[in-house]
Swiss-Prot record:
The gene is nfuA. GO terms for molecular function: 4 iron, 4 sulfur cluster binding; iron ion binding. Keywords: 4Fe-4S, Iron, Iron-sulfur, Metal-binding. Disulfide bonds: none annotated. This is Fe/S biogenesis protein NfuA. GO terms for biological process: iron-sulfur cluster assembly; protein maturation. Homodimer.
Length: 192
């Protein structure tokens, strides 16, 4: 479920040495499966461990994950790096914004996962997002843009050079193209 590097394990062990015996670390996701999902790590006193928490043993400490966060922390990794300018703890959780789907899930679910987990985080930096409305019988993904993407003058570049290229590479036998059905209205909300 969660990989914690040796350096991060050592860091947590040092931090937990100053806490009451039995204190764990809790790894969690706030707003799991949503575009605004946030991951975090906190101390978890022994009396805060819930019966349905998943307990993960590591070198000298345990990590706990609540049942609501667990599916969204699949393939998560925590690392700790010391650099000249200081140290940094990183938590990468590729499934925090969208629950990972099985390889044999329906095509629309697999495409939706790629959109939520990989494409929308990039569009969010411009205040935008894209949603899939359907996939036609001939393999065309029908998309609708919102936020800063609605009315953006660069939408054709984003659609063809970004999203279509990614989906064709990921699903070469199933997706044949993309089509934008957004009623684009340029305004102050538009990125460009």
């Amino acid at each position: 479920m969660i990989r914690i590097s040796e350096a991060a394990q050592s860091h947590f062990k040092k931090l937990l040495a100053d806490q009451p015996d039995g204190t764990c670390i809790r790894v969690f996701v706030v707003n799991p499966g949503m575009a605004n999902a946030e991951c975090g790590v906190s101390y978890c006193p022994p009396d805060s461990v819930e019966p349905d928490d998943e307990r993960l043993p590591f070198n000298g400490f345990d990590a706990v994950v609540d049942s609501g966060s667990a599916p969204f922390l699949e393939d998560a990794a925590i690392d700790f790096e010391e650099q000249e300018m200081g140290s940094q703890l990183t938590l990468k959780a590729p499934n925090a914004k969208a629950r990972k789907v099985a390889d044999d899930a329906p095509l629309i679910e697999r495409v939706e996962y790629v959109i939520q987990a990989e494409i929308n985080p990039q569009l969010a930096s411009h205040g935008g997002q894209v949603m899939i409305s359907e996939i036609t019988d001939d393999g065309v993904a029908i998309l609708q843009f919102g936020g800063g993407c609605n009315g953006c003058s660069m939408i054709d570049v984003t659609l063809k050079n970004g999203i279509e290229k990614e989906l064709l590479e990921r699903f070469p036998e199933e997706v044949k193209g993309v089509r934008d059905i957004t009623d684009h209205e340029p305004g102050e909300h538009s990125y460009y």
